[in-house]
């Protein structure tokens, strides 16, 4: 779809001078209205009212995408990677909002990701452009059909109450100054990129929390929501003055929001009469907040993408239950504007490493099909058309990562999307891009190992290990290359493509030989001294011998906790479950050691930490990937090899020693799957409830 197909002959408009978050207004006359439809997009984010009534409850729309090419320097030279670009529009039925006589359409456009400068290197930041709006309002009254198109002759603008804005750190809203007269707008050229109707869930207020007042001192009130979420407090400003709200994920020793964990997030309101106050153009990631000034706290609105929870899990063992609950809370807090982010405050980016790692869990446990379909487009857009190089984030903003664990999103996410939902179209569309990414990895390989990324970029292997990194980066990056090559072979078979499979298999063999040559010790059976899960990466590829696996089990039985980063934690857990060490895998999941989920729970966390021991962000989903093993290897609800859309499953439950009951459910494309495990007279038992259309292969034992 192009501009005219979406917006007819409407023009993009922007203020003639710089404005932070402008209001746009258009007025028109209507007789007795019969119907009306509004086609609209406002970049960065917009909200609209017609005759003072909201057009929609959607928030932070349109979803974030790589809108157009940005011009900036990358390490002193023009950034020359070529991406795909697209923008999203929305269509609303406004029939019930039209009135006889004069009608007023008011649109508030905030910077969002379009007008927010983001870091591009050194001390540079770059935005796409300034806030802009385009709409076509088609309506029918007793006099016939009419169309109101945005343009300099129909739209005016003025400043809004938002006088300072930073997507990451917050807003200043000033209700004491006059907004000024309406001003002319200027027209902009239309986007030449693809236009799509937004088919991804918007953000919205999903629930409300009544926060608890902890204490008051010197006019400062400190509140606790009881959980780490995203959204905004709703305040009632009671008298003229300035109200300052500071947000944090933790409290300091002084009982105030901890500066180490407030990430610069602040809201300032200037008022001269009582009014309700909340964030408008951004969200805050926080558990605690302080309020200074004349205000009452009414509630806290929890805001994220309108994605339902489609799973249940119940365990008397506290850490297993905490892991499920914390993952859902963390993942939902990181679903905004159509992307799965790394954290909801500091960076807010769609990191491909974090996203590919937890995508299977996100698809299994949440009603997220449309959400991930949109993010797949972002992943596809943010590959360099010339070299096949994959970015560390989608949409692209400069940041850190690695070629393997981050770049493999181009293969892993469409493959898991197919497995979960049975839709092969994203794989079909992206398969040529997978091959181009493989070519990019070949260009950054030496001696059969992936050893570098583009100059000026990081080349991470695993990430956020406790202590000093000891697992070699090339081992990890080559692991992901081999895994992706194997997945591409499976994808080619699913799609009926024969041409490249021999080449891909030859590359697999070459890379496996390189891992043996560089890292395998035939005297011990270990790879890279079994450091930080190195053996598990290799066993997962089918490399090594019996000693390689046994040394994994010995190491983690002795440690009693993890020593791995985000990728190794997932792989170690799965390798132990799949290769005869279920009890040990369960012990790691329930461990309360220093590097464990139990440690996070015991320190009061309600979401997953970025680092095992805390520090920086307290809301990072990346360590949550093993949550899916609660369903696949404990409840035993696992898709059969080669199955998609849950048409065929293996029911292979496991009830760990010391745990007397587990239960849970998954809403699949075939219907709801339920499993229950319990002990009766000391014997473990299990039952499954599955729709008749699912072919269930049941294993005999429960433990």
Residue spans for each PLM region:
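Repeat-solenoid scaffold signature
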Residues: 107-117, 121-136, 140, 560-592, ...
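Non-catalytic C-terminal accessory modules of carbohydrate-active enzymes
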Residues: 134, 149-176, 198-199, 254, ...
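Active-site acid/base region of carbohydrate-active enzymes
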Residues: 45, 297-326, 330-333, 339-391, ...
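Extracellular/oxidizing-compartment recognition motifs
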Residues: 1-345, 370-373, 390-396, 425, ...
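Solenoid-like repeat scaffolds
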Residues: 524, 555-563, 594-597
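Alpha-helical support elements that line or immediately flank enzyme active sites
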Residues: 231-238, 242-249, 289, 354-382, ...
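Well-ordered alpha-helical segments within folded domains of soluble proteins
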Residues: 351-363, 372-373, 404-416, 474-489, ...
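Carbohydrate-binding surfaces of carbohydrate-active enzymes
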Residues: 489-505, 570, 580
């Amino acid at each position: 779809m192009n501009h005219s197909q979406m917006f007819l002959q409407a023009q993009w408009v922007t203020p003639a001078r710089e404005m932070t978050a402008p209001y746009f207004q258009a007025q028109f006359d209507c007789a007795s209205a019969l119907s009306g439809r509004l086609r609209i997009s406002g970049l960065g984010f917009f909200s609209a009212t017609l005759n003072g009534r909201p057009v929609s409850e959607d928030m932070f729309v349109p979803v974030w995408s790589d809108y157009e090419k940005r011009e900036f320097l990358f390490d002193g030279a023009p950034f020359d990677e070529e991406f795909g670009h697209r923008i999203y529009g929305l269509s609303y039925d406004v029939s019930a909002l039209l009135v006889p006589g004069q009608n007023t359409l008011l649109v508030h456009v905030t910077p969002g990701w379009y007008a927010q400068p983001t870091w591009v290197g050194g001390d540079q930041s770059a935005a796409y452009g300034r806030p802009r709006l385009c709409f076509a309002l088609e309506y029918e009254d007793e006099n016939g059909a009419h169309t109101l198109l945005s343009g300099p002759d129909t739209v005016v603008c003025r400043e809004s109450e938002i006088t300072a804005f930073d997507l990451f750190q917050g807003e200043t809203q000033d209700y004491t100054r006059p907004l000024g007269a309406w001003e002319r707008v200027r027209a902009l050229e239309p986007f030449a990129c693809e236009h799509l109707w937004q088919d991804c869930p918007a953000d919205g207020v999903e629930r409300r929390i009544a926060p608890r007042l902890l204490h008051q001192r010197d006019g400062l009130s400190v509140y606790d929501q009881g959980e780490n979420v995203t959204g905004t407090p709703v305040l009632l400003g009671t008298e003229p003055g300035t109200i300052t709200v500071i947000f944090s994920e933790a409290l300091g020793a002084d009982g105030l929001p901890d500066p180490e964990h407030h990430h610069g997030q602040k809201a300032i309101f200037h008022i001269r009469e009582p009014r309700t106050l909340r964030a408008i153009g951004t969200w805050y990631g926080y558990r605690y907040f302080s309020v200074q000034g004349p205000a009452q706290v009414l509630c806290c609105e929890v805001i994220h993408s309108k994605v339902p929870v489609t799973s249940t899990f119940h365990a008397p063992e506290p850490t297993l239950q905490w892991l499920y609950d914390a993952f859902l809370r963390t993942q939902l807090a990181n679903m905004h504007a159509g992307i799965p982010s790394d954290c909801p405050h500091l960076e807010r980016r769609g990191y491909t490493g974090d996203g590919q790692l937890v995508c299977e869990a996100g698809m299994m446990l949440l009603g997220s099909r449309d959400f991930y379909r949109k993010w797949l487009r972002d992943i596809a857009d943010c590959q360099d058309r010339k070299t096949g190089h994959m970015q560390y984030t989608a949409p692209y903003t400069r940041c850190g990562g690695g070629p393997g664990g981050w770049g493999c999103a181009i293969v892993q996410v469409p493959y898991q999307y197919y497995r979960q939902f049975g839709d092969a179209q994203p794989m079909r569309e992206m398969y040529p891009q997978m091959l181009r990414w493989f070519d990019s990895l070949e260009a950054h390989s030496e001696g059969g190992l992936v050893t570098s990324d583009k100059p000026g970029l990081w080349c991470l292997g695993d990430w956020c290990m406790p202590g000093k990194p000891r697992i070699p980066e090339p081992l990890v990056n080559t692991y992901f290359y081999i895994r992706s090559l194997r997945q591409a072979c499976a994808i080619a078979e699913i799609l009926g493509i024969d041409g490249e499979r021999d080449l891909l298999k030859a590359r697999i063999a070459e890379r496996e030989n390189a891992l043996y040559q560089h890292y395998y010790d035939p005297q011990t059976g270990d790879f890279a001294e079994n450091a930080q899960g190195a053996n598990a990466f290799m066993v997962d590829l089918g490399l090594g011998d019996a000693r390689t696996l046994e040394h994994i089990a010995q190491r983690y039985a002795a440690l009693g906790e993890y020593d791995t980063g985000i990728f190794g934690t997932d792989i170690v857990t799965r390798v132990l479950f799949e290769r005869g060490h279920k009890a040990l895998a369960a012990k790691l999941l329930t461990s309360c050691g220093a590097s464990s989920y139990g440690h996070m729970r015991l320190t009061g966390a309600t979401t997953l930490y970025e680092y095992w021991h805390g520090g920086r962000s307290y809301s990072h989903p990346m360590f949550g990937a093993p949550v899916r093993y609660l369903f696949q290897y404990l409840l035993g609800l696992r898709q059969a090899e080669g199955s998609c859309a849950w048409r065929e499953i293996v029911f292979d439950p496991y009830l760990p020693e010391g745990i007397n009951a587990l239960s849970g459910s998954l809403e699949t494309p075939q219907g709801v799957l339920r499993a229950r495990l319990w002990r009766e007279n000391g014997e473990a038992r299990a039952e499954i409830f599955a729709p008749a259309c699912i072919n269930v292969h049941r294993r005999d034992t429960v433990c």
